[in-house]
């Protein structure tokens, strides 16, 4: 394996290690500092430019490998078509198949490295988003279930009063708005109960 493909393999090993760290079921108190530690070097503009250059170089290697596999296939077909000397053809065929094997290996190596790069970047984004949502949830004041029920009862009474006024004054628009507010309050209460259950499962 040449030097640049050895470097590509080293990059692939690093990406596999980072993806494994992100995918492991680590508790939140350890996951956040570990994720920030892994993400810290990539915040530098110099590192970002270097990564883009390396990815561009790997992409060129990937395209070159595809072109090489295609040309070797054509050469293999031509060598199979011409069967003048059996011993020479067999020896040439082994050499061509060997070059095809190495070209396919390099193509798979560069291709999976590019694919795993995008997977790791997307996984980083999802983990950071999850940690941010957890921080927002923990920073928000807890809402008691009694307060939620009280708000629901107040909204229901307001809707009932609005229905009475609708019959008396024909204010349909006000009645529809209060009904929408009641539906939104019910949805908020349902989401809060769901988030509390999820938080209990996480902790």
Swiss-Prot record:
Keywords: Endoplasmic reticulum, ER-Golgi transport, Membrane, Protein transport, Transmembrane, Transmembrane helix, Transport. One of its GO terms (cellular component) is endoplasmic reticulum membrane. The keyword Lyase does not apply. This is Endoplasmic reticulum transmembrane protein 3. The gene is YET3. Residues 1-6, 67-110 are lumenal. InterPro entries: BAP29/BAP31 (IPR008417), BAP29/BAP31_N (IPR040463). Present with 2840 molecules/cell in log phase SD medium. Belongs to the BCAP29/BCAP31 family. Its main location: endoplasmic reticulum. The chain crosses the membrane at residues 7-27, 46-66, 111-131. Residues 142-171 are annotated as: Disordered. The keyword Transmembrane helix applies. May play a role in anterograde transport of membrane proteins from the endoplasmic reticulum to the Golgi. May be involved in invertase secretion. GO terms for biological process: endoplasmic reticulum to Golgi vesicle-mediated transport; intracellular protein transport; protein localization to endoplasmic reticulum exit site. Residues 28-45, 132-203 are cytoplasmic.
